[in-house]
From Swiss-Prot:
Subunit and partners: Homodimer.
Organism of this sequence: Laribacter hongkongensis (strain HLHK9)
The protein's name: 1-deoxy-D-xylulose-5-phosphate synthase
Known cofactor(s): Mg(2+); thiamine diphosphate
Its biological purpose: Catalyzes the acyloin condensation reaction between C atoms 2 and 3 of pyruvate and glyceraldehyde 3-phosphate to yield 1-deoxy-D-xylulose-5-phosphate (DXP).
Length: 622
């Protein structure tokens, strides 16, 4: 472990504020060294944290935290904040079961003023806190720290519009590193890039001086014209139109400039906007060169960096989707792919390279992504929206109003369904089966293995209406996808094991744990495949020939597939004991996915235990 004598003296930000300003650069170096050592041993978000170190130090140095409120957007960049706020000795537990969360969490520290994990919430939350301070007569200051990637979301601009029209003492800091996870997209990003490149100004100034150098009056007039044009192009034009006092851009790695600027801003009244320019991965050469790969990392050697993983014999579900997307695009030129800023995470890198004109990254704009797809579907295209389960929640109205109500053929490829592990409850796909199956016209599918995933994606693409295929993070049971694509019968499951007495109706990722449990219980197992429409004939058949039905899903029990089975039985007037197994009615925290599933009783041992407890209880009620 690197020696960190100055950092060792900092337990809370009050200790930091006792330092001489001249000591802050040394603290930044030690904090960066500690961060590299820490994350290399635990894994986690990395490049964004390296880029936020100086800004974090300056904020805690100038502001009286925790009384003054720092509201972080997304939370990827808050490891330095956690280290400086009393959690340094727990950094070795980062994102592990029972350890520190990878994002700000209100019940973890009083310095974490707002829980977060999704993008673009900081300005709205900070405005609410600023209004609360005004209403209660408090003189506390409130700061929102938001990245340029998060500024592509409409929610951020809704909050800016509201905040700029208020008289609250709010500071919004734009941490501009020209990259959130994947490179940023859209007009706003091009606007920032054009401004920061300096080419326009450099060309204009050098050309003016060269051409008009011998004519001072004309040169002076040209400089006036330059200032007029510059005024039209600077970010101040945009943000001051929202009602903010714009300051910047400033170097986000110059502690002297940051501290001076923040001290001055802290004395100002009304909404302020500070544009800070940082470099993702700053101070660690490998991360500076490849910030995408170093955004989220597993354990690595600080000296050697990330090591390429050897090819796995089992392709992950994300890769299965990406391969299917390219294969399907080769067959049907109507296919277009849409992602809300998750090219790598959703498996669309190959598709972008092979079909750049049919690939659309709309930025962190889930609502727009869904309506954009609906418009494409209206006029003959076949859009596939690749999106995480947790982020589809942000576009629920568009899903209902713009797609399903009009019965448009949009395919939703829903990644990260179920528990996701280290990222915790903000990123878990715990609710999609419940919130999708209640929507008219929706067809909802849950594959049990890699090949079934490929075939159900094909089935979805052929369907003339809205469809969703949900699959978990990581690898499946190892069923090699078959190259040939075959549409599966809509709304039909398949009986995978014939037993007696007990029938397990398993959905998606729970099929293989159910099969293993059935070996111990001598139970029948149905791979239901479809959540909507359900295979009602198979349900009735199993109900008639078994004494207990067990539903198993990696989704909350409330409103999920178990509820759907009970509704089917009730509608048919069939009375049979039913045991519903799924995620509990509370948020499942971060940790190793296998351990979390075991805690929820959704591993093989848990299924066996629950069934035997039900049989021992001898209950005849659902």
């Amino acid at each position: 472990m690197t020696s960190t004598p100055l950092l060792d003296t900092i337990q809370i930000p009050a200790d930091l504020r006792e330092l001489d300003r001249k000591q802050l650069p040394q603290l930044a170096r030690e904090l960066r060294d500690f961060l590299v050592d820490s994350v290399s041993q635990t894994g986690g978000h990395f490049a964004s944290n390296l880029g936020s170190i100086e800004l974090t130090i300056a904020l805690h140095y100038v502001y009286n935290t925790p009384d003054d409120r720092l509201v972080w957007d997304v939370g990827h960049q808050t490891y330095p904040h956690k280290i400086l706020t009393g959690r340094r000795d727990r950094m070795h537990t980062m994102r592990q079961k029972g350890g520190l969360a990878g994002f700000p969490k209100r019940d973890e520290s009083e310095y974490d003023t707002f829980g977060v994990g999704h993008s673009s919430t900081s300005i709205g939350a900070a405005l609410g806190m600023a209004v609360a301070a005004r209403q209660t007569g408090s003189d506390r200051r409130v700061v929102a720290i938001i990245g340029d990637g998060a500024m592509t979301a409409g929610q951020a601009f809704e909050a800016l519009n509201n905040a700029g029209d208020s008289d609250t003492d709010l500071l919004v800091i734009l941490n501009d590193n020209d990259m959130s996870i994947s490179p940023n997209v859209g007009a706003l990003n091009h606007y920032f890039t054009r401004l920061m490149s300096g080419r326009f100004y450099a060309t204009m100034k050098s050309g003016t001086n060269r051409v008009l150098g011998m004519a001072p009056p004309l040169q002076k007039l040209a400089h006036k014209a330059e200032e007029q044009v510059k005024g039209l192009l600077t970010p101040a034009t945009l943000f001051e139109e929202f009602g903010f006092n714009y300051l910047g851009p400033v170097d986000g790695h110059d502690l002297g400039v940051l501290v001076n600027t923040l001290q001055n801003i802290r004395q100002l009244k009304g909404p302020q906007f500070l544009h800070v320019v940082t470099k993702k991965g700053h101070g660690y050469k490998l991360a500076e060169k490849d910030p995408i790969s170093y955004h989220g990392v597993s354990k690595f050697s600080p000296e050697n960096g990330l090591v390429s993983k050897s090819g796995s014999s089992k392709p992950g579900y994300t890769q299965v989707f990406g391969d299917w997307l390219c294969d399907m695009a080769a067959q049907d030129e109507r296919l277009v792919g849409i992602t809300p800023a998750m090219r790598e995470g959703s498996g669309m890198v190959r598709f972008e390279k092979e079909y750049p004109d049919r690939y659309f990254d709309v930025g962190i704009a889930e609502q727009h992504a869904v309506t954009f797809a609906a418009g494409m579907a209206c006029d003959g295209l076949k859009p596939v929206v690749a999106i995480y389960s947790t982020f589809l929640q942000r576009a629920y109205d568009q899903l209902i109003h713009d797609v399903a109500l009009q019965n448009l053929p949009v395919v939703f490829a829903i990644d990260r369904a179920g528990l996701v592990g280290a990222d915790g409850p903000t990123h878990a796909g715990a609710f999609d089966l419940s919130y999708l199956r209640c929507i008219p016209n929706m067809v909802v599918m849950a594959p049990s293995d890699e090949n079934e995933c490929r075939q159900l994606l094909y089935t979805a693409f052929l369907h003339d209406g809205p469809t969703a295929v949900r699959y978990p993070r990581g690898t499946g049971p190892g069923c090699e996808p078959v190259a040939a694509m075959t549409a599966l019968p809509l709304g039909q499951g398949t009986l995978r094991r014939q037993g007696k007495g007990i029938a397990i109706l398993a959905f998606g990722s729970m099929v293989h744990p159910a099969l293993a449990a059935a070996d111990q219980l001598d139970a029948s197992v149905a791979d239901m495949r479809f959540v909507k429409p359900l295979d009602t004939a198979l349900i009735r058949q199993l109900a008639a020939s078994h004494e207990l039905l067990v539903t198993v899903e990696e989704n909350v029990v409330m409103g999920g597939t178990g509820s759907a089975v009970l509704e089917t039985l009730a509608a048919a007037g069939i009375t049979v004991p039913v045991l519903n197994l799924g995620l509990p009615d509370h948020y499942v925290e971060h940790g190793d996915p296998a351990l979390l599933l075991a805690d929820c009783g959704l591993d093989t041992a848990g299924i066996v235990r629950s069934v035997r407890q039900r049989l021992d209880a001898g209950s005849g009620t659902a």
